Amino acid sequence: MNPSSSPSQSTANVKFVLLISGVAALGGFLFGFDTAVINGAVAALQKHFQTDSLLTGLSVSLALLGSALGAFGAGPIADRHGRIKTMILAAVLFTLSSIGSGLPFTIWDFIFWRVLGGIGVGAASVIAPAYIAEVSPAHLRGRLGSLQQLAIVSGIFIALLSNWFIALMAGGSAQNPWLFGAAAWRWMFWTELIPALLYGVCAFLIPESPRYLVAQGQGEKAAAILWKVEGGDVPSRIEEIQATVSLDHKPRFSDLLSRRGGLLPIVWIGMGLSALQQFVGINVIFYYSSVLWRSVGFTEEKSLLITVITGFINILTTLVAIAFVDKFGRKPLLLMGSIGMTITLGILSVVFGGATVVNGQPTLTGAAGIIALVTANLYVFSFGFSWGPIVWVLLGEMFNNKIRAAALSVAAGVQWIANFIISTTFPPLLDTVGLGPAYGLYATSAAISIFFIWFFVKETKGKTLEQM
């Protein structure tokens, strides 16, 4: 490769790249908002439809499977119709889901709207990191790729905050009627309309991915965008991209197969990163955190407030990753995070393993409660500066131009399936073996992740996408 053809820090249009990456990351914001907004409405939904916990739980878990479906489908759509049209499709799904989730007649049509929104979430989880990686200069790609996770955790935080505010103003999520005669829980879902419409409108205003345009034989359009994004020796950059895309056929899932017929090793690594990101149990902390905080002695109201605070900590730690990912690299941050999660989850396993059970709930007293409170937030910190944002950075950049969208869709689909497995197995684990052994399983996954990163993941800091 000709070093002079690589974009330099002086020629890159940082403000423009940050702007268009921020628009793409709005999909991540909606991803976080949509998955978290239901938490504040669960009790009201159960009361409104008179459903049992199993059926209510399906409204959460089936949305995760919808996300897996959306992720698997987004890659082919993005390769056939482009990154921008895929964003617009996701925005439409978010908009329809937001409206429909607030106007259900039965629990079953509510589940339909949640699954539809889940498909949008899955599509956004693929297209945002792919687009950001494809428009970012190499020296900025880690920081810009981390915007995806920052947007996700910000979406979660804003959803929790808006749920809390609406419930506070209405006197409870089940308060009916409230604003304009609609129950408070309906407004929790309708709030998503604002970012969904903003995402859809802004997607019309940003340029298509230059890598996609080159693959479609539109080199002149790609060159104009690359000049605005990177500057430097654009003709050489176009030649490099042309050498790494499939010009003889449209991208397809069969490109992920090796000559022996199995998946390419890099695809397995992407799937491993996605699965381990979920198997360390981060969503247990956010989905079921009230169990943890009540066991320490907090009331339900204070438990919800602490969950909001934990979400804010997650935002701050993601900013740490943005600051250091292009300085120290991806691999060191992942290793530090894995070690931190292994230690903190191990401590939580020991602490809750010795907890007394009162009315079916683990209860901690004295120093044990304080240790659990501090350790849980240290665990969130360890995840927040490493596996939260860095996995999205790697998934966006580790695959070559020929297979990026397809491979990312497979990896993201695996991530949503792993999320579904963890979210649905935690309640029975809690009922059968308790919190201690459950955290022990997640600690084991964190320990495995250390060896996985050490032996299988290569550093990508500073490399162009054409060097992958």
From Swiss-Prot:
Stated name of the protein: Glucose transport protein
Gene: gtr
Main subcellular location of this protein, as a coarse class: membrane
InterPro entries found in the cross-reference section: MFS_dom, MFS_sugar_transport-like, MFS_trans_sf, Myo-inositol_Transporter, Sugar/inositol_transpt, Sugar_transporter_CS, XylE-like
Organism of derivation: Synechocystis sp. (strain ATCC 27184 / PCC 6803 / Kazusa)
GO biological process: carbohydrate transport
Domain of life the protein comes from: Bacteria
Side of membrane Extracellular, spans: 39-58, 106-114, 171-186, 287-307, 353-366, 434-436
Transmembrane segments: 18-38, 59-78, 85-105, 115-135, 150-170, 187-207, 266-286, 308-328, 332-352, 367-387, 413-433, 437-457
Topological type in the membrane: Multi-pass membrane protein
SUPFAM superfamilies found in the cross-reference section: MFS general substrate transporter
Single GO term (MF): carbohydrate:proton symporter activity
Disulfide bonds, paired cysteine numbers: none
Topological domain ranges for the Cytoplasmic compartment: 1-17, 79-84, 136-149, 208-265, 329-331, 388-412, 458-468
Pfam families xrefs: Sugar_tr
GO cellular component: membrane; plasma membrane
